[in-house]
Amino acid sequence: MWEGYADPKFTKEFEESHHCKVTASYMGSSDELVAKLRGGSASNYDVISPSSDVATMISKAGLATPLDLTKIPTYTQLSPQLRALPLVKIGGKTFGVPFMWGPDPLLYDTSAFPNAPDSWDILWDPKYKGKVSVWDDLSTVYMAAQLLGYDRPDPGQLYNLSDEQLENVKKKLLELKPNIRKIWATGGELTNLFENHEVVLAMGWPLMTNDLRKHGFSIGETIPKENTTGWIDHLMITAASEHKELASEFLEYMIQPKTQKAVTDVTGYVPANPAAAQFMTADERKNLHLDDVDLYYQRLYFWQDVPRRDKYNQIWNEVKAAQ
C-alpha cells in the first residue's frame, strides 16, 4: 500500500466489524510494488493499491484477480470519468476500483518563498544548491521531460519517450544533482527533510503537505505553470490472495463515502467517490478542487502504462549513480 492507505483512523472500524486485522506493508514506488509481486512474496498480500502507471501491467500479467462487482455495489458511485478509463479493464473484466487520485505537486518552505514558485525550473536555480529533494521514482523523469517540452502537443508522450529524448532528460537531471540534498523514498523521509530545514524545495505528495501542516510547519504546495503529472490509485485483489471474499468486502468498505472522507482527511488526496463531498466543508471541497474538478483534471497528466519502463528505469538509475 501507499503510505496513509491503511491508517487506523479508518481501518479500525473494518477490523472490528469483520473480526480481522489489517496489516500494511508500505511501498515507496510503483516499481517496488511490482518487484514484491513478482519476487515470490505475492501471497503475503491480499489487497494492493497500484497507481495508474502499473495498474494495466499488473492486470495483464495475472498478478491481480478479476473483481466480482456485484460484491462491490458502491462501485457505481465512483467518478464516471475514472471508471471509464481503460487502465484496469482487460478482456471485458475489471481488475481494480478507483480509490484516490491527485497530483505530484511542487512543495516549498514558505519561509524561503513568500510567493509560490511558478515553474519547476526553480529546482535548478544555483541559489538552492543542496536544498532540493526529488522523489526516487520515474515521476522525476516525467518532470524533467516536461521542462524540455516533451509533453507538447501530447502529454501522453511523457510515458513513451524516445532514446534521444531520454538521453536529454538524463542530461537535464544530471545538471540538477548539485542542488539535490537527498533523493527521498518515503513520505516520512521528505517530511523530516523539511522539518529539519535541510531542504526548501521538493516534488512531493499532498500527504506530506497534510502531515507538515499538522505538525505546524509552514509548507506551501503548488502546481507550476508547466502543469504536473498525477496519478489514480486503484485497489486490487492479488491473484495469490487466500482471502478474496474478505478482500472484496474491504474494497467495498474503502470506497464508501464516509471512508473516502476519512482517507482524504489523512492523506489530502482527492476521493474517487464524489459522494464523499457531502461530509466536507466548503473549504475542504475547494482545497480538493471538487467544485472545479474538470478544470483540475486539465492541470494533471495522469500516469499511464510505460511501454519502455525498463529503459526509463535504466536512465533514472544512471542519474542516481552519477557522482
Language-model regions, residue ranges each:
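Early extracytoplasmic/lumenal segment of secretory-pathway proteins
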Residues: 1-57, 191
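A ligand-binding cleft/hinge motif common to bilobed small-molecule-binding domains
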Residues: 55-57, 201-218
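Paired acidic/hydrophobic, glycine-rich loop segments that form the ligand-binding mouth/hinge
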Residues: 45-49, 183, 200-205, 220-221
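Extracytoplasmic ligand-binding site segments that recognize negatively charged/polar headgroups
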Residues: 3-7, 44, 49-55, 59-195
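Conserved C-terminal helix/tail region of periplasmic/extracytoplasmic solute-binding proteins
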Residues: 293-323
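A bilobed periplasmic-binding-protein/Venus flytrap-type ligand-binding module shared by bacterial periplasmic
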Residues: 105-112, 147-148, 232-243, 262
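Periplasmic-binding protein-like
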Residues: 167, 172-176, 213-239
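Mature extracytoplasmic/periplasmic domains
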Residues: 229, 238-297
